Amino acid sequence: MSEMNFETLQTFRRELHQIPETALEEFKTHDYLLTKLKSWQQDYMTIKTVEALPTAILVYFQGTNPVRTIGYRTDIDALPIQEATGLDFASQHPGKMHACGHDVHMTMALGLAQYFSQHQPKDNLIIFFQPAEEAESGGKVAYDMGLFEGKWRPDEFYGIHDQPNLPAGTLSTLAGTLFAGTAELKVDVIGTGGHAAYPHLAKDPIVIAAELIIQLQTVVSRSVDPIAGGVVSVGVINGGFANNVIPDQVHFEGTVRSMTRTGLETMLTRIRKIAEGLAIANEVTINVSLESGSYLPVENDPILATQVINFMQKQSDINFELAQPAMTGEDFGYLLQHIPGVMLWLGVNDSHPLHSAQLTIDESAILPGYNALKSFLLWRMATSEEK
């Protein structure tokens, strides 16, 4: 039985990096993970897959003297991005890339699985390989379909996410809300088209859409507590086909984010009311779609998070920083609404942000990240208190 080393983790990461797959299509990734897990099978391990969520995998390790069941979650999907890193082990799937570091997340989860296949844990341990974090709300789907019922329900859940802005191998979290809750905004402004020379005979959806986009910026500045914060950003707008034609319709899309559930609901209500008012004032139809409920704020349990922070701050071999809240969204927040837990950042030291086609993770982060997680889990299992 050998301890995990950098070369093994690096191999996992590079092999996974080459086969990125988007939400609910992670079949090669699933097969890769399942092959590794089955090769480490022990009598005290149970590997679970389900037809209703075919790319998900759960691994249950029966503890030797359990007082709790600890859960560890990793996401497994990639993004629809054409990789532009030039790496020797770049994506082999055109138009798809692990641009959010889920290859690194999976690597550390595999490292934990291999370790606990060689060292039976004291507490029960569940490792959840979750599909569809970037889209399709995989965490919510898994929870709502009953994947965590009975012995498969953790008493507490942990997870990690890469952070390019932190030094490689640095861990970071806080006892509170780490990530924002998000809602996806889609708007259709339906007016009346016509000749651009006669705007008075049309109901110009371009002008109305522009006015609506500007008005939406007041949602944060005038309806949200400045301490709580929020974001309304429009990233897509489409309308028109000729310079001398007023179109019938304009479509735009964006994201709405808040650090609190109440703040998010306030923002969604204001967006709907502003759209309704503009529709009446301009005698047009404005259809607003706001998809929320899956990407809730990632609210770390304060007691468990304090334990994580205290443990990591006391370890001489762990570099730890207290985190600041981020407007990043993560569907782990949905699981944490039902099961207490903690998400952490892992620094991967790159000048390119998450979701960049040029994101190049510093692989020296992987081993210290894995070792910190393993050390914390072993310490947690050695404590008898419920929280």
Curated annotation (Swiss-Prot):
Instruction: Please provide the record's keywords in A-Z order.
Output: Amino-acid biosynthesis, Diaminopimelate biosynthesis, Hydrolase, Lysine biosynthesis
- Report the EC code(s) recorded for this entry: 3.5.1.47
Task: Please verify whether the record's keywords include Isomerase.
Answer: no
The family database entries (SUPFAM superfamilies) matched by this protein are listed as: Bacterial exopeptidase dimerisation domain, Zn-dependent exopeptidases
Task: Give GO MF terms, alphabetically.
Answer: N-acetyldiaminopimelate deacetylase activity
The GO annotation for biological process reads: diaminopimelate biosynthetic process; lysine biosynthetic process via diaminopimelate
Report the active site residues. 75, 134
- Describe the family membership recorded for this protein in Swiss-Prot or TrEMBL: Belongs to the peptidase M20A family. N-acetyldiaminopimelate deacetylase subfamily.
Q: What does this protein do?
A: Catalyzes the conversion of N-acetyl-diaminopimelate to diaminopimelate and acetate.
The protein's name = N-acetyldiaminopimelate deacetylase
Organism, as annotated: Leuconostoc citreum (strain KM20)
